[in-house]
Amino acid sequence: MKPSLFTALFATILLFHPLPGAAQQASLPDPVDGVEWRAGTAVEGGMILAKTAPGVRLELDGVSLPQDVTGHALIGFHRDSDSPVTLTILHPDGRRDSVSMMPAQRDYAVQRIDGLKRGHVTPPQEVLDRIGADSAAVRAARDVIDAGPDTGDFIAGLEMPVEGRITGVYGSQRILNGEPRQPHYGIDIAAPRGTPVMAPAAGRVTLVRDLYFSGWTFLMTHGLGLN
């Protein structure tokens, strides 16, 4: 079974706007006591914004979900969620309700490139070492949940960080010489060098680092597991 909950959810406009293809067939769960569904859809790579009644706590597949002081929480779905997830609602009087969600499936752009030299597919060891260190730093940054007073600012809406041509889309993947590469978990936007880039919402910077694959990169946490 693939993981159903992102340890870190990516700040994309997908939370508040319709998704193409299969996502249009997705929907919010049925109403349940103690929880209000505010936005989003149950779809691969998507999120649902929920708001609980006072004292209600949420667990997703047995893992407690972060909630802000107003009861907002995020439910995230993996890019390849091929199994249903279970949301448990824990009421202050001891009652427990559960909701099963089967994310709608999506089709992703897959590019196959064969005949490449091995050096273009498998980097040398020193590069692999740097990639490994980069990955560890990114994981540590994404593990930071608390955004302090800015937690939940994104609930009012997310802004595009820059205007420009979309050059990469969420979920796309390359297969080089038959070897699947890591899927793309974001949106690439091309803009001239020196163009100001704005945060999509208020938050806390958790990483500034020159990464092998993406160059100078900064990560922010917006609270509730969204970064």
Labelled PLM ranges:
Residues 89-91:
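Conserved structural position at the C-terminal beta-strand
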Residues 63-69:
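Short beta-strand segments within Ig-like beta-sandwich modules, predominantly Fibronectin type-III
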Residues 24-49:
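Extracellular ectodomain segments of secreted/surface proteins
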Residues 49-57:
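Short proline/glycine-enriched turn/loop motifs at strand-loop junctions of beta-rich domains
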Residues 17-20:
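N-terminal signal peptide c-region/cleavage motif recognized by signal peptidases
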